[in-house]
Amino acid sequence: MKILNCYAGIGGNRKLWNCPNMQVTAVEYDENIAKVYQDLYPNDIVVVADAHEYLLNNYQNFNFIWCSPPCPTHSITNHFLNAQGIKRYPDMALYQEIILLQTFFKGKYIIENVKSYYEPLIKPQISGRHYFWSNFKIPMLQFEKQIGRMNGKKADLGGKIQAELRTNNHKKLGFDLTKYTGIDKQKVLNNCVAPEIGLAIFESALDIYDASKVEQIGLFTEL
């Protein structure tokens, strides 16, 4: 099974993936982050490149594709930023990738992003504050260790307590980045997809997902 993991980061989504004859190609633009990924997953092929362009030129060579394109220009935080005079267009690369895979890709795919400040141009599946575009149904899971991109909760806590919780949740992801340099470790971990969620989605793509193994609160609802 040939898998493409775009915008791979350090591979939070990929951490628990395992199936016979699995070959993962990870694409990450930041060379230092790519080195961490390669160290964590020595059997994966790691490509330092623009994931958006790599996807366009290579999607047809894979059976399963996961994309988590950058989310800042789509996030609801843009309401606050706009009020502060910070104005920016939403990055339409997200929808280019959705249209490409919806129209031409023959395998299974999932594109993940945060819930946007605008009405989505293409109807997604919804989980918490996040949107998913996929050609298969995926279970909605709730884990205490959800953080960063995959966290649908907003704690009403003081800054110190929030920082402590964030540190504890980073540890729960199961990555020890102590020896690595040249990366923003907190940002990298914040951007991680919780490994259990990555596994559940991966198993759903393979039609082997077992809901009894995890806490399940239903299926994604549609807009």
Regions found by a protein language model. Name each.
Residues 1-223:
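Conserved active-site and SAM-binding loop architecture
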